[in-house]
Amino acid sequence: MKNYINTDKLIKLYDDLVQFALDDIVARIVQNEAITGAAEFRIWKLQQLGIHLEKIKDYIKKMTKFSDEEIENIFKTAGITLYKPVTNLFIEQKTNFPLNIEASQYFRDVFSYYLSSTKGTVQNLTRTTAISSQNLLINKLDQVHFRVVSGIQNYSQAISEAIDEIGKSSLKVVYPSGHQDSVDVAVRRAVVTGVNKCFSDLNLIRAKQNGYNHVLVSSHLGARHIDNPSPEYLSHDIWQGKVYKVDWDTVPFVKI
């Protein structure tokens, strides 16, 4: 039996991200009459997503009414050129991607990860346990998750916008256990945890594909400490900042 793949949801996720980035670029150009550093970065990201530079220019022209000459001068002043992907920086890895999206290998890996980790539904990317009836929350979290993973928006911007939008129609987020959280707490937790999980899984996948057997776990000040924890990993300061050998036979993997 062939696995179900919700291509409509995947395409919508992609289209929403592209449209968000294009509108943000236009707003910054109109405000500054130049391409700012943030706009330049988003143009670079859009090209990685498979959007040709000329398509980006056409959209800017359509929305700003600038002439071709004005747009070319703006891009020339900013020094923006056609994106050329860097290959073989790591061992080249191909994925069987189900959609005809000419994105960079990183984004194709992210999309494939979404498909595998959600069993093709591309739903609830942050793995929030909020009750399924809270569709506005779950759909917005999916959108925000992809904006952060893609690099189009940073954590604070994405979380702030999500809280503003969701907060207009929902005062509390309810979980199956009956526990309730305020919108800002639920959104922040879901986005940060979901993005970290995505990056962690992709790093492990790439490490295994490239034949690496050791990992260095990051560390930070103020890590949780528990006296005589059971199990031991509950006290984070015990295991952070160390090198570990990975037993790949025991690690559960999402395949991409």
What are these regions (language model features)?
Residues 1-255:
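Domain-core detector
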